[in-house]
Amino acid sequence: MKALRIPEATVTRLSIYSRFLERLEQRGITTVSSSEIAKGVGVSPAQVRKDLAYFGEFGTRGVGYNVKDLIHYILKILGLTRPWNVILVGAGNLGTALCTYRGFIDRGFNIVGVFDNDLTKIGKRIHDLEVLPLERMPEVIEQHDVKIAIIAVPLGSVQDIADQLVGHSLKALLTFGPVVVDVPGDVVVRNVDLAVKLEILTFNLVFKELHSII
């Protein structure tokens, strides 16, 4: 039987739904409709129902969804009913900012090690973590059962660091900038390029003008 392929956009929206639902729960709201979720996150009610339908039947027709239960189901789908230990490679400006980003902790991602090969950075502390040399990665990965790594190094070093992390049996990597990393098929890599996000914004700013010309 062929495995069901879940669109990545659906997974992204599930994360957005969960945050919206958590805000409702904080306000004491116990039941919500697909229309209310859709309005709150900027999609159609049909899209909400379709995204949830990939994973089963949720809610009651004419009543809606139990907010607490739906939060639990979505967090379970996203693998967020347990904490995840993460290491960060690169203690420069980006790495420092990521290490102190509260949003990771709030979603259950705990940075347990920060690494760099720059002798001027090794030994310094970022928040409550000491910057360690790359040679210490295997030790920390094993000690904390790390599955995920964030790579925040110069573009020319990303592939080398990715190779080292894969060699240490990590299967999930997050990278930054315009770089394509070559990894084995069983390793998941996701890239964040902030310049691309800005280009999407500029496209939307000029789209109406371009459309009128075309």
From Swiss-Prot:
NCBIfam families linked to this entry: PRK05472.1-3 (NF003989), PRK05472.2-1 (NF003992), PRK05472.2-2 (NF003993), PRK05472.2-3 (NF003994), PRK05472.2-4 (NF003995), PRK05472.2-5 (NF003996)
Assigned protein family: Belongs to the transcriptional regulatory Rex family.
Entry GO CC: cytoplasm
GO terms, molecular function: DNA binding; DNA-binding transcription factor activity
Oligomer and partners: Homodimer.
Repeat keyword on record: no
Cellular compartments annotated: Cytoplasm
Residue ranges of DNA binding: 16-55
Name assigned to this protein: Redox-sensing transcriptional repressor Rex
Pfam families for the chain: CoA_binding (PF02629), Put_DNA-bind_N (PF06971)
Keyword Protein transport recorded: no
Function of the molecule: Modulates transcription in response to changes in cellular NADH/NAD(+) redox state.
